[in-house]
């Protein structure tokens, strides 16, 4: 039987996942921090994280359903659809290879709040530098991307294996530096999230399959639905925001949040060193 506090924990973490998954502020980092603050851990947390990530990715699938349908129906004959699909596969593969090789090691050594805080600050500084650097836009839309554009974005996505880095942050900022327009970089980041997150969820789901229990269905349902709703809100808001704004506000948020975590640890207010995902 699910108690009220467990339901509240599921709701809180679902909101955090939904709001942060597609913003360049690191959803994994926020999950580690918030889960530690509300004391949500153990085997249930491992399975729960997989479920709420699926909720978030479903929001992107729904938001871009027309584009996805156009690509799927156009695959047999349309060169544009074929090239777009190939670019996604090319961008996806580096994360598959490096994820299989290094995922367990990274999770063991780097999934802690101090790593998250450091990565938030460093990533924020890099984002500010990238935003202030002059960009020569070579690629206006995702349909104009070349296979080399896709490969480079896929390689920088691998940096997000370090918690606190941000998958969307690394791919969007990387895309800007590689000559993609702000719109193209953001949209390709969303599309690339689909195979990347689904692949990670399937891999983790199989690996931790014994942690899924029927008794946790209600907890998972709350997290899944909440994550879906708030991810939808975040995706739509970000697409509107980037049309007229830079990513600097996210960079400053990362720096401030990371420094706050480091300060509370340094002064001994919170024992972040023991916080694990």
UniProtKB/Swiss-Prot annotation:
Superkingdom of source: Bacteria
A Gene Ontology term for the protein's cellular component: plasma membrane
EC number: 3.6.1.27
Catalytic reaction annotation: di-trans,octa-cis-undecaprenyl diphosphate + H2O = di-trans,octa-cis-undecaprenyl phosphate + phosphate + H(+)
InterPro entries: UppP (IPR003824)
Database matches in Pfam families: BacA
GO MF annotation list: undecaprenyl-diphosphatase activity
Any one GO BP annotation for this protein: peptidoglycan biosynthetic process
Record key words, sorted: Antibiotic resistance, Cell inner membrane, Cell membrane, Cell shape, Cell wall biogenesis/degradation, Hydrolase, Membrane, Peptidoglycan synthesis, Transmembrane, Transmembrane helix
Membrane topology: Multi-pass membrane protein
Main location: membrane
Subcellular location: Cell inner membrane
Transmembrane segments: 5-25, 44-64, 86-106, 110-130, 184-204, 219-239, 255-275
Enzymatic class: hydrolase
Other comments on record: Bacitracin is thought to be involved in the inhibition of peptidoglycan synthesis by sequestering undecaprenyl diphosphate, thereby reducing the pool of lipid carrier available.
Family membership: Belongs to the UppP family.
Reported function: Catalyzes the dephosphorylation of undecaprenyl diphosphate (UPP). Confers resistance to bacitracin.
Name used for this protein in its record: Undecaprenyl-diphosphatase
Organism this protein belongs to: Pseudomonas savastanoi pv. phaseolicola (strain 1448A / Race 6) (Pseudomonas syringae pv. phaseolicola (strain 1448A / Race 6))
